């Protein structure tokens, strides 16, 4: 009886915590890559002969029942955050230039990098997927702010989501088979650019920014498949089956990112920088799949793929025959080998909104908790 009562109380506390977020922010401003893009990529490159499978079924099958430009079977972390804040799903900027962005605007683009397209090419790590970088997205933001009456106030009352961004600066080299030694010099450059962009956003008016770290890519099918033939047994974590060195690399990136956020907090004490610990929020279900509703024997395999190790190969991508989708995406963490399922993104979002994986907790930065009602800005 006590256990049942305790379970009910915990559920009520979590529900109240999530509900209390409604009214915290009047809009969301989002940057990033495929972890956050809600539809920009198809409008940017839809007529291109290299149109990716992401805009084809079965993408979007679980929630939207059609492809939306999201790289998943359903909703992303940004969607769950928007819903928890009582806001509509965030509109992609490119597809909605004639729409209202009063409740949010999304500049994220599938495949985007933190570092500039030309710069990456010049150092031997070309982005063959898109020429959009974080700098491009900031230019779009400035273009947008110039079209509204008070762009500074709009940013002040918004929750700014900084991606995740930076993962593709490493993912593209990984897909090309680059070594750890080759990628290591990129990290300081990526962190510096993310940091300088955050400072620029604060100067433009942003006061609350959520900055995610990178996910454990050593657990992703595309990475596991890429290094399968060159890895030995000791290269894998016996508890999860994930590759150790890519995860260690991600931890290194995330540690430097947190140090950069600490530096910026000292320079701009009025701004609230929330570190979103995507890595540990995700590692929960790789360490204990069954506890979170996933099947242990397929936790490292893609739901939708063309076969091969981990059901991922570069020539049989999800959305393009003969690749096939699994019957139950909710039992998988990986959707297409590169991106996660809605079920996995939901767990990460819950870890940020209800758990210990947002530092500081998102409610501590809620303007509604710190301002009188008549001070709230309505755009």
Residue spans for each PLM region:
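Conserved active-site regions of diverse hydrolases
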Residues: 1-379
């Amino acid at each position: 009886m006590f256990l049942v009562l305790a379970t009910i109380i915990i559920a009520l506390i979590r529900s109240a915590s999530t509900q209390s977020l409604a009214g915290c922010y009047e809009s969301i401003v989002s940057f990033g890559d495929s972890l956050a893009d809600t539809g920009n990529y198809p409008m940017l490159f839809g007529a291109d002969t290299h149109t990716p499978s992401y805009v084809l079924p079965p993408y979007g099958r679980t929630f939207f029942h059609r492809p939306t430009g999201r790289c998943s079977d359903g909703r992303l972390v940004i969607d769950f955050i928007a819903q928890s804040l009582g806001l509509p799903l965030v509109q992609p900027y490119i597809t909605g230039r004639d729409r209202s962005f009063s409740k949010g605007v999304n500049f994220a683009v599938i495949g985007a990098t933190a570092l500039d397209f030309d710069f990456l090419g010049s150092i031997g790590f070309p982005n063959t997927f898109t020429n959009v970088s974080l700098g491009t997205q900031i230019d779009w933001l400035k273009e947008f702010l110039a079209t509204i009456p008070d762009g500074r106030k709009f940013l002040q009352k918004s929750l700014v989501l900084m991606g995740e961004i930076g993962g593709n600066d490493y993912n593209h080299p990984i897909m090309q088979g680059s070594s750890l030694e080759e990628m290591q010099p990129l990290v300081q450059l990526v962190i510096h650019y993310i940091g300088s962009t955050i400072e620029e956003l604060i100067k433009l008016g942003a006061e609350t920014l959520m900055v995610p770290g990178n996910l454990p890519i050593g657990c992703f099918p595309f990475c596991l498949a890429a290094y399968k033939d060159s890895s030995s047994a000791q290269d894998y974590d016996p508890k999860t089956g994930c590759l150790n060195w890519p995860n260690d690399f991600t931890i290194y990136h995330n540690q430097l990112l947190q140090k950069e956020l600490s530096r910026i907090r000292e320079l701009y004490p009025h701004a609230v920088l929330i570190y979103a610990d995507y890595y540990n929020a995700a590692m929960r279900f790789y360490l204990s799949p069954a506890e979170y509703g996933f099947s242990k024997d397929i936790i490292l395999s893609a739901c939708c793929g063309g076969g091969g190790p981990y059901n991922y190969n570069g020539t049989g991508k999800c959305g393009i025959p003969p690749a096939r989708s699994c019957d139950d995406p909710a039992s998988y963490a990986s959707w297409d080998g590169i991106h996660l399922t809605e079920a996995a993104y939901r767990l990460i979002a819950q870890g940020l909104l209800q758990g210990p994986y947002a530092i500081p907790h998102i409610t501590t930065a809620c303007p509604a908790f710190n301002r009188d009602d008549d001070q709230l800005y309505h755009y």
